[in-house]
Amino acid sequence: MTWRRVLAILLVGGVVLGVAPTGYALAASAGRISTVDDVPSEPVALVFGAGLDIRGEPMPFLRARLDLARQLYAAGKVRVVLVSGDNRRANYNEPDAMRDYLIDNGIPAAKVIADYAWFDTYATCVR
């Protein structure tokens, strides 16, 4: 096999491996995505952490989750937002960063509850 053929196979394989998870996620979520108007009213919205940047601010994916929770609150779909994330290290605190973000974006402090006992998603759901 020539080096060009090996390179072509590796390139195609890399593209397939890079695109396949996105394709699967899109196919698996088909029909499961709702608008804020379609979501039923519930007492609490639970927002799981998804990472902070080097400054301790929510990463883009987490900001999107928090913005959706804010929209649900503003639309009267939820009364309280519960934020749950990693805070096992002194310099990394997802619940506080998430809480601060929501308060800074218009949700009253009394309506944002932080879960500091996070270990993993399953444990949060069980509690």
Map each language-model feature to its residues.
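A structural signal for short, hydrophobic/glycine-enriched beta-strand patches
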Residues: 26-127
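N-terminal type II signal-anchor transmembrane helix
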Residues: 1-37
